[in-house]
Structure formats: structure tokens, C-alpha cells
């Protein structure tokens, strides 16, 4: 039986000129409390091993102690930059176990998709802005944080919180949209469109940015599939795989949008530039989705006095005995929840999470050998990991 001890570099077998150094767990470029153990020969990375666990908060154990609806605040705290998306996936999974998925009102579903796509743009803005900081571009970070603040205010207006929302419940929503929200959101989208075009021009098409990211950290498609990579990282390697299309959950089948993929336009398919390009392109697609949701929420599924966002929320949650897996497309990739239920309680026997950041980080060692230390920072930043989700 193989040892469960973590991988460590062997100090006793160092060759001449090789040094083992630590990056983190307090280093700003590691995007959280992640420690990278790096074997270097001068400025060249010969090997790298990520060490995690510094932010472990026992999410899965908490989920075994609390009723299903009371777990949602803990779901928020995994990928805290995309809490709406995480809530959507979790609530959808419990609804499918209960067999009430088709009973959810259309207005509720469109609101869920609307706030999830706003949160997707917000998450991608953090990824793009902090990535600029990683490779020496400070000003774009200020730009995306300025525009992300508008999204934070919209979501705060909806839920009362700026980041950890507890808004999407099993069977419905905490509240309906505030009066005037749809119009204010339309104004924001009108403001955002030229800002996204500016972001594309100033960052993605920037010559210095291209020199810093093109042909760096190339992730071949076969390697991405073998490691189970999902989300923008997989699509940047050239595969059109998006669970919003593949699984067609919620009202996404009724919405028209495209799946951006990496093409190696300025370098090699699957490099750091492609990963950032895909995230910016996905912001444009999220804008299209939001516009279509607003059209439905102001038209066919407009607000009525009789509408109750909690009408389908079950008073007691008693799923049958089953093993059940649900997945959804988070900004980082495939977020999955595996439930094992016993049938006589409103608390799951087991709730296992498939965290996309955790899986995506696993490929770092494979694509970072024989690169410069400065390029290792660029590679890690292009992964867009969140340590709250990795450590859970």
C-alpha cells in the first residue's frame, strides 16, 4: 500500500547548483496560503510541489452535521469569489434529490442565472486583475476592481451581502429582486460593454502582456483531460466543454451564448495567454446571458404581486436513500457535490465536494518543469485558484 505522506523534495540528492526554496505560504503571488516547494538550478525550475491545507475549515464535516438549507452559508465560503455559482450548484443538487427541480418557478430560475452570471464576471475580474499584478501590470487591477465594485453593489442590493450571500435556497430564493433592480442592472450592462472592449484592447492585445504570457505554461489538451481539468483552463486548451451547454441545467438551454476556446492565436494553444483570453471572452458571453435574463424578467416572467420566491422551499427535506452527484459550471470549472443520504433525516450522511481549483492545481507540477521562476508565477496566476475551495 502506498504511503499517504505528502510529496517532498529530497534534500539528500541535490546536484551541484540546485537549491530548494519555498514560495509561500505568505507570498502574494500564491493567491492565498499556498506553499510551493521549488527545486531550482539558478533561475530554472527543475521541479515544484504544491503544499496545501493551511486554510482547512472542515466544510465537508460541517455538512454532515447541519440540515441541507443551513449548509449554504458554508458553501459560500469555499469559492468566496463566486458564492452565487456555488449556491446555485448546491441548491440544484438537493432539488434533484427531492424531485422538485421541475417545480421551481421560471422567474426563480432566471434570477438564479442572472445573479450567477454577474458573479461569474466578478470572479473573472478578480482573476484578470490579480494576474496583471502577478506579471507586473498594476493599473488594470484598479480598473477591474472599479468595475467589479458595481457588481458587488448590485449583489448587495439583492442579498444584503457583498460576497457571502446565502441568497439561493433549496427550492427558491431568500428574496425576490428589489424593485428597480432590472433597470439598474441594464444600465450597468450598458456601462460594462465598452469597459470590456477596453480591457480586451489594453490587456489581452497588449504587446508586453503577450510577450509575458504567450508560449508560457502550455497545457496540452490530452494532459488536461487526463488530469480532469475543467473550466476556462480546459477550454483554453481547445475543447468546447461547458456544463451550461453539456448538462443544459436550469434555464441555460433557453439562452443563446457561445463557448470561447483557446486557439493559440498569439502563441500555443493552452498557454497562459489563452487562459486569460478565454476568461475575458467569457465575460462578453455572460453579458449576453444577463441581457436575455433581464428581457425575460421584464417580460414573460415579470414581477407580480402573487409571486413568492419561497413558495417551493420545502419545510422538511427528507431525500430517499441514494448516492447522488450533481455538477455545475463555476468560474473555475466543474463544481460537483456528491451526496449520500440515509432517508430518515434532513442531514446528509456524506457530502463530498469536487472543487475545480483543487483539481486544476494538480497539473502545476507537470507543466512547470524547466521554466524560469518568474514564469512559474505567471503560470500559477493563470490557473485562477482560490484556496478556500482547495482546502475546504
Curated annotation (Swiss-Prot):
InterPro entries: NADH_Q_OxRdtase_suD, NDH1_su_D/H, NiFe-Hase_large. The keyword Cell inner membrane applies. One of its GO terms (molecular function) is NADH:ubiquinone reductase (non-electrogenic) activity. It comes from the Bacteria. It is found in: Cell inner membrane. It catalyses: a quinone + NADH + 5 H(+)(in) = a quinol + NAD(+) + 4 H(+)(out). Keywords: Cell inner membrane, Cell membrane, Membrane, NAD, Quinone, Translocase, Transport. GO terms for cellular component: plasma membrane. It holds the Pfam family Complex1_49kDa. Its main location: membrane. It is an enzyme of class 7 (translocase). It is a peripheral membrane protein. Its EC number is 7.1.1.-. HAMAP family: NDH1_NuoD. NDH-1 shuttles electrons from NADH, via FMN and iron-sulfur (Fe-S) centers, to quinones in the respiratory chain. The immediate electron acceptor for the enzyme in this species is believed to be a menaquinone. Couples the redox reaction to proton translocation (for every two electrons transferred, four hydrogen ions are translocated across the cytoplasmic membrane), and thus conserves the redox energy in a proton gradient. NDH-1 is composed of 14 different subunits. Subunits NuoB, C, D, E, F, and G constitute the peripheral sector of the complex. Belongs to the complex I 49 kDa subunit family. This is NADH-quinone oxidoreductase subunit D 1.
